């Protein structure tokens, strides 16, 4: 009885014991219905870790995580897929093509994210560049995740890809026990990326990577 009331009796201990700060569930049993809502609720520039638990389901969302959302643990309960179908040549709301970056299903702009057990998909098909995940932040760690697409599935942007750019510091991203698939250049960008115990599968007879190594990297 007393153990069950510890979080109530000692608020600081309650925060330590709490398994997640936000729960996302499509059936309404959580704090939010969508990941977009949960990301928006993360405090800006927070030094403490925010935990988001995503319950089983397919979430049809295009998510842009800004640089202000940092130090987040995002993990799944059951099979979770985040999917969208934009592609670079698609006309956006401005009347212009979305471009490669604009085609991303999920954009990670913040630092220090740890992501466990989610599947990220760009379902546009073989229509040219269509990014599933774009990473601009540093200190990102993906564990047991799946990245599905065709051309340009995983965009590890890093410091950028401008001609002649010299960098002294660049984004570092780690992948453990992950699965990545695509057709052409489906892992690309200028970030420093480590893939450990990952399966990388080409679904076409083409190039797997298109690295962009800046001077000074």
Which stretches of residues belong to each language-model region?
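Sequence-level preference for short, compositionally simple segments enriched
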Residues: 1-217
